[in-house]
């Protein structure tokens, strides 16, 4: 039921020099499904990550953060689906560490140079026997063109793989950017289960890469929401292999802006693909708040509207009960909001002006917009010059069915 989700063909996915990927069936999620993915990175690759702010952080998130904090090289990633290894306490932490150790032996790299990722059911022990038994097959499958298989291998309730690939000219040289993401529910990243892996063959200095990962997550994965739930496992990883002959050492370098913009476009596309494939989604909604006093209040309003079950179900039904949007704006937490200055558009239709119904608004016009698969909700607060945008979807009967049946 994905909403206008465009998936490139396997032949359109560009390998990133310095990245090899292998996928295997380990039987962690269900029999006959690829559920274990390994990335091997060339020596000299730089890696940075942004992780969930949920206080109930999954074991692999804790291990990733610890390994990155050591400041050494990262040579491999390992991702399992079907089990989140979250809410598993000390045994879960040991399982994440043991996963790194097992892969390290196969690749002949130290365990602390490996980052583990898990996605799936929370509060269940990771089946280490199946995971470790599947690692040799994933390693044997390592190849430069493994992105398409990996996009399938990290899926849980996703209906389609999420992949982005492009080439850009940076400083007269060709740079490749390819990434994958997964997530369909429990999506309100705050740095769904949301995982994102984005790689480039450009070289980026490690301190700059860390800052860039934060900035990219903030304009992409931190601007989407499906159901308002922030996962225990949200992770976004940015990889720069340095194989393209282009190196950026500081934000002042001439090549930086073009590289940053290309990476931001890729990250935004991967994030929006998650919303387009959200559990049961039939509508893709852009909530844009303008004339805010600052970014914080713009996002407060945008998320209040995007998270409202009443708003989301109204969009599913194509029911222009748009007072629900005004109500959400009102409880967004801006105490000194002057509603008499507020304006609201649904697509190109002005619904509310000066805090009340536009005298020229006709419900048939609102319904015409709400029947569309992609809808823009634009809100002007009349408080300043700041604008920001959040992407979300509707709530359908299928969303309830998927989550009610998730463990069946």
Curated annotation (Swiss-Prot):
**Gene Ontology CC annotations of this record:** cytoplasm
Q: Record's HAMAP family? A: ArgJ
Q: Which gene encodes it?
A: argJ
Recorded protein name is Arginine biosynthesis bifunctional protein ArgJ
Signal peptide span per the entry?
none
| Native source species | Bordetella parapertussis (strain 12822 / ATCC BAA-587 / NCTC 13253)
| GO biological-process terms attached to the record | L-arginine biosynthetic process; ornithine biosynthetic process
Catalytic center at which residues?
193 (nucleophile)
Q: What does this protein do?
A: Catalyzes two activities which are involved in the cyclic version of arginine biosynthesis: the synthesis of N-acetylglutamate from glutamate and acetyl-CoA as the acetyl donor, and of ornithine by transacetylation between N(2)-acetylornithine and glutamate.
> Could you say which EC number(s) this protein's record lists?
2.3.1.35, 2.3.1.1
